[in-house]
Structures are given as structure tokens and as C-alpha cells.
Swiss-Prot record:
Similarity remark: Belongs to the cytochrome b family.
Organism field: Sminthopsis griseoventer (Gray-bellied dunnart)
Cofactor, free-text remark: Binds 2 heme b groups non-covalently.
Additional facts recorded: Heme 1 (or BL or b562) is low-potential and absorbs at about 562 nm, and heme 2 (or BH or b566) is high-potential and absorbs at about 566 nm.
Protein localization: Mitochondrion inner membrane
Residues involved in a ubiquinone binding: 201
Main location class: mitochondrion
Record's protein name: Cytochrome b
Topology relative to the membrane: Multi-pass membrane protein
Keyword tags: Electron transport, Heme, Iron, Membrane, Metal-binding, Mitochondrion, Mitochondrion inner membrane, Respiratory chain, Transmembrane, Transmembrane helix, Transport, Ubiquinone
Protein purpose: Component of the ubiquinol-cytochrome c reductase complex (complex III or cytochrome b-c1 complex) that is part of the mitochondrial respiratory chain. The b-c1 complex mediates electron transfer from ubiquinol to cytochrome c. Contributes to the generation of a proton gradient across the mitochondrial membrane that is then used for ATP synthesis.
Length: 381
């Protein structure tokens, strides 16, 4: 009798993707984040769907509707806390996933990598428009500051900003369209995830050594399904701990006040996962320059495959590149800290130095380290 799992048109796709998929035998826990991101996406879509059933995207009632969800809807407080902290978990997994890709040279699968960068940008856009929806002080002023950056574009900037706003400032029209974007984007992300996996399964997974693993493959199920299940339990443990014990730990107290266009908060700052980019934006005293640096800080990921100079794929056996990678990690943590600080000395100069170092590491130092390591492997003396 033929196995339905291997013959049915739909089951066959699932089988080739999650069950009989040949996977390298040595992939570490750093390869768990892909599945965790998929789970985060499902959690966000489900909690978001239930929130959307009770939310109203009107400037007069948006803030009250969120309070109503937390007070009057059955387990509304839990759904809201899971959704808000789920976003933080999503970005934590995203950053670790991208970091893994850089460390182990996964970016050499160019199609998979490029779709991944597009996914990162789409998730960032989704999180930004989502943060505006509760219509608190930081929601309103965050939206005002970030959308205002469009006006830095020469000639068309102001028109573009007003087009996004649907008026002359962030108002009812802006909130309504941001809700529409926030609802549709996760489904676009889901479609992109399918394409991301499609390209990944064309080549198969990379592995920590960076060496072709074809000589030693094992089936995805049961080995990596059980490993992913462990990752899932740890993810849920952290998410539930956050949502149940300290749901407002990563939020901003200003967002407990309804949006007031006449009262600017003392320190306007985005959620923690955007602070590194915000610090780079603020470190340049010119508006257009700051916007370009902000874009470059993310889009630089697209050119990483072309900056790979080493003869080895992974950093596993490249100590100089490893050192630079961990300096880059520390630098990003520094930028995140600076992004949350007021614009005054010494934070300004620290932010500027960290921003310069960020681009220097990726564009100059890491490619040079790769070339030097090649030389050390085959010295000419």
C-alpha cells in the first residue's frame, strides 16, 4: 500500500518540507530560530485577529477600545499582553536569526538571504504601524516623528508625507490606514515566508562548519521536530513570563496617556527593537543624512554577500572575524542603549562613534579580516 503522506498532492509538500526533509546532522540550536519565527508569526496573527474584533480605528475611541479590551473582554488583557510582548519575542528571534546568518555565512544563499532582508523590512513596517494603533502619547508622537522623515526627501518629500498622513498631520485618516496596513501586512509576510522556505529548500540548510553537508544528512522528523519543540517550549516560557508577570516591562509609560497633539513627551523614542536604528538616525545632525543612514543601517544587509572575502564560509574557524562579529554585536547593544537616552553629551558622541563603527565593521574591517585570514592559511613567506 502506498503511503498517503508521500503521494497526496498536499501532504507530499508538507512531507518534503517538514518530515522527510534531508537536514545536516550537525546544525546547532542557532538553527531553531527559523521555526520560532514561524511560531511567533502564528501567535501574532491569532492574537491580532482577536484584538481586531474589539478594536476601533478612530482617534476618538482607539485608546478607549484598547482599555475596553483589557478590562471587559474575556482574557482581553492576556491577548493584548501576548500580542505586545509577542512582538518583542519576534524581534529577539529575528535579530538572533540574522546574526546566525552572518556568523555562519548563510548569506551566501543569496535568494534566501535577500527575501529574508525584505521580510525583516516588512516586519519592521508592520511593528511600526501597529505601535501607532493604541493611540497613546508615544504612539502619536512616534508616528509624527517617523512619518515626518519622509519630508526630508528632496522635492516630493512634503507631498509624500501628506499623502501618507491623508491630511496635514497625523490624524484620523492616518490611524485608519495604519490599521488597514497592520491587518494586511502579516499575510504578506506569510506569503514571503513561503518564498523564503522555497528558496531555502532549493539549496538545503547551511551548517556550523560551512562545509557541504550532503555526505551526512538525517531526516527532519523526528530529530529536528523534537529539537524545535524544545525551542518552542523555551519561547513560550519567556513569552508567558513576560506577558503574565511584567507585561509593561518593555513598553513606554507615556503610552498610558491618550494622544495629545498639544503636549510633546520629553523623550520621543520607539520600541526597544528600533532603538539601534533610531540612534543611527539621530547621530547625524542633518535630516536627509539621518534618513539615508537609517535606511543604510538595514539595507547594508543586502550587500553582505558581496563583501565575503574569506575562503571559508563560516566564522567557526576564523578567530579574527569572530572577534569583529562580537564587537559588532556589542556595538549594536550600545546603539540600542544610546537610542533610549536623551540627546545630550556624552550620549551624542557615543552614538556617533558607535554609528561610524557599525558601518566600518561591516564595510571595511570584516572583509579585510577575511582577506587576512586567507593569507594566514596560505602564507607567502
Amino acid at each position: 500500500m502506498t503511503n498517503l503522506r508521500k503521494t497526496h498532492p498536499l501532504m507530499k509538500i508538507i512531507n518534503h518540507s517538514f518530515i522527510d526533509l534531508p537536514a545536516p546532522s550537525n546544525i546547532s540550536a542557532w538553527w531553531n530560530f527559523g521555526s520560532l519565527l514561524g511560531i511567533c508569526l502564528v501567535i501574532q496573527i491569532l492574537t491580532g485577529l482577536f484584538l481586531a474584533m474589539h478594536y476601533t480605528s478612530d482617534t476618538l475611541t482607539a485608546f478607549s477600545s484598547v482599555a475596553h479590551i483589557c478590562r471587559d473582554v474575556n482574557y482581553g488583557w492576556l491577548i493584548r499582553n501576548l500580542h505586545a510582548n509577542g512582538a518583542s519575542m519576534f524581534f529577539m528571534c529575528l535579530f538572533l536569526h540574522v546574526g546566525r546568518g552572518i556568523y555562519y555565512g548563510s548569506y551566501l544563499y543569496k535568494e534566501t538571504w535577500n527575501i529574508g532582508v525584505i521580510l525583516l523590512l516588512t516586519v519592521m513596517a508592520t511593528a511600526f504601524v501597529g505601535y501607532v494603533l493604541p493611540w497613546g502619547q508615544m504612539s502619536f508622537w512616534g508616528a509624527t516623528v517617523i512619518t515626518n522623515l519622509l519630508s526630508a526627501i528632496p522635492y516630493i518629500g512634503t507631498t509624500l508625507a501628506e499623502w501618507i498622513w491623508g491630511g496635514f498631520a497625523v490624524d484620523k485618516a492616518t490611524l485608519t490606514r495604519f490599521f488597514a496596513f497592520h491587518f494586511i501586512l502579516p499575510f504578506i509576510i506569510t506569503a514571503l515566508v513561503v518564498v523564503h522556505l522555497l528558496f531555502l529548500h532549493e539549496t538545503g540548510s547551511n551548517n556550523p562548519s560551512g562545509i557541504n553537508p550532503d555526505s551526512d544528512k538525517i531526516p527532519f522528523h523526528p530529530y529536528y521536530t523534537i529539537k524545535d519543540a524544545l525551542g518552542l517550549m523555551l519561547l513560550l516560557l519567556v513569552l508567558l513570563s513576560l506577558a503574565l508577570f511584567s507585561p509593561d516591562l518593555l513598553g513606554d509609560p507615556d503610552n498610558f496617556s491618550p494622544a495629545n497633539p498639544l503636549n510633546t513627551p520629553p523623550h520621543i523614542k520607539p520600541e526597544w527593537y528600533f532603538l539601534f536604528a533610531y540612534a543611527i538616525l539621530r547621530s547625524i545632525p542633518n535630516k536627509l543624512g539621518g534618513v539615508l543612514a537609517l535606511l543604510a543601517s538595514i539595507l547594508i544587509l543586502l550587500i553582505i554577500p558581496f563583501l565575503h572575502t574569506a575562503n571559508q564560509r563560516s566564522m567557526m574557524f576564523r578567530p579574527i572575524s569572530q572577534t569583529l562579529f562580537w564587537i559588532l554585536t556589542a556595538n549594536l547593544i550600545t546603539l540600542t542603549w544610546i537610542g533610549g537616552q536623551p540627546v545630550e553629551q556624552p550620549f551624542i558622541i557615543i552614538g556617533q562613534l558607535a554609528s561610524i563603527l557599525y558601518f566600518m565593521l561591516i564595510l571595511v574591517l570584516m572583509p579585510l579580516a577575511g582577506m587576512f585570514e586567507n593569507y594566514m592559511l596560505e602564507p607567502k613567506w
